[in-house]
Amino acid sequence: MIFKKLEKYLKNIDGKIAIYGIGKETEKNIPEINEYVEIVGLLDGFRDNGNIYGYNIISLNKAIKIGIKAIIVIARPGSCRAIVTRIKDKCNENNIKIYDVYGNNLLEEKQSKCTLGKLKPYYKKDLMNKIEEADVISFDCFNTLITRQLFSRYDLFELLYNKLSLTEMSLKEFVNQRIKSEKSTAIGLAPNLKKIYEDCVFFSGIDFAEEEFKIDKSVIIRREELVEVLNYCINKGKEAIVVTDTYYSEKQIKSILNDNSIYGIKKIYASSEYTRGKDTGLFDIVKKDYPKKKILHIGDDYLSDYKSAIKSGINSYKIYSCEDLFYGTNFMPDVEPDMELDSKIKIGLFISNIFNNPFVFERLEKDICIQNNKTIGYSFCAPLIMDFVKWFEEKTRECNDCQIWLSARDGYLIKKIYEILYPNRKTHYVLTSRTAAIRAGTLSEDDIAYVDDMKFGGNMDLCLKKRFGIDVNKIDIKQIDDTQQGILKYKEIIIGEAWKKYLNYKKYLKKICEKNKNILFFDFVAKGTCQFFIKKMVPNKIKGLYFLQLEPQYMNDKQIQIESFFSEREKIKSTIYQDYYILETILTSFSPSVNEFNISGEPIYAEETRLKEDLDCIYEVQSGILNYIKDFIKIYPIEQLKINKKLDEQILS
């Protein structure tokens, strides 16, 4: 089906078009497209002659000579990008538009979504110059040297409520009491945490102050660039101190700093110890302690860190907190503070990672630039992958006594995540690939026809070799059936070879397969080809649990069961269909793809085509994803996680 966005364009086009792609989806879409516009021919990356679906296959140059106004690319998103890269220069030169079947303009450059246009820039070199002029460098603590992996400080109170399983009052009552008590005890002085809880109307028997402190410590991380500034100051012989508005004691602040490997602080001025804050005299005490020293204070709050320091005769330099940077961008504008806690934690992990560095203005542009592969995995990919694994586990709970098969190579990282989230669940990493499944599973003429529908970019000799593992130089010509057309000429040879590979593959699967247990089969993004052919090799019932199923209509007559994380309806509306190929690249293992199995049931791998730098990049992204998973469950129990695909997509896209 063509989509309304493309339909609108086709109605208004004044001229001819060509379609790029000769697969089954093209055949399906041609009649609808032809209702609106004249199709002059079909384009393909490997062929520029012949006829299919009633249209000539032509070259791009010929299409240009005919005078086409547009090209409609009917292919998967990853293929669309590769096609556009190949043809965009000629199309731009000849004013030819390129659209996909969804109506997206494929020549349109995507603009950066995340810019710092709202914020006034500052530069690290300016701060370092000010440091050179000072004797004592004072650092704010929270949001400066350290930050919380939370969307809001108030999320801490909800975490405390959940941890203590408080049923005597509602969450809202608890949070309101906690905030109200902090505000009332702060009037005229700087309270400590015990005093705040003493004024709360809570039942006794629990040390709320200690429990809150423990949770807070668990969600605090360093702001790396500012810790580097601190270490620079110490190495230059400057005296480093901390001046902080806090309800924690000096001892507790020191404990937090030590836990985050922040050392070398000569003195900590905690407002709770002096019963006064930065705006009520704490800086005056600092000034008095260093009467003849030039002091520079670094902090994130304009009033308490910048204005109050200057008022006390102390130079000050304001930096942005992670929260400042987040709200200063145009990223995810519809984030709401009243969303579910697990979603807020996702955003908190994102903010504390992406905006950890306060010195983001070193480039001329104000775009946020991610140059660390681990950050890509941690902040952008991990939330969606974690939610998928949670969904997958929920589906396995619906199946009594099932075995879990995580198919290669996409199942490699999924298995690692499973072992972190559900360490007591047994999973099997199953070696397979579309090539291995086809070579061992093509046992009938119908199977050959199914495989032949997947258009192959090469001649017959190459097709036989790559798809079926058959060396044309070793073929007995007596087995070639000249009464048939195309690939069916080699039917006898293909099926004969497949039976050998089938028996070898079965030996491998027998080592894994648990008798009398249904199989839940993971594939990431697929039509179902591997599952279809593997189903022939095991007696067990198989149900597929996919991230996304492509072209499900091709499996309608194959009697295989597949359920997807993203439904067909969601896929149409979702941006994930445009971006899944990125995730597919990331999930992979570090072994080459398996081609087939030997007589002992051992894998025979294809030649590795990825470069070392490609594998290094994948490793770093995967490390980021695994770190995110560990950080999330440290803060929030996976059992209570509610899947939020909308938020995951916002983050990824």
Identify what each model region corresponds to.
Residues 190-242:
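Short, acidic loop-to-helix structural element flanking the phosphoryl-transfer center
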Residues 31-35, 53-55, 82-93, 254-261, ...:
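Short, aromatic/basic amphipathic alpha-helical patches
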Residues 94, 102-109, 285, 293-298, ...:
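Long, low-complexity, Lys/Arg-enriched
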Residues 49-52, 241-243, 247-294:
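Substrate-recognition "cap/lid" segment bordering the active-site pocket of phosphatases
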Residues 17-20, 72, 138, 245, ...:
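Short glycine-rich phosphate-binding loop at a beta-alpha junction
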Residues 10, 57-67, 123-130, 284-288, ...:
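Short amphipathic alpha-helix with an adjacent loop that forms part of the alpha/beta core around
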Residues 128-176:
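Active-site neighborhood of HAD-like aspartate-dependent phosphohydrolases
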Residues 1-110:
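Hydrophobic, well-ordered beta-alpha structural blocks that scaffold small-molecule cofactor pockets
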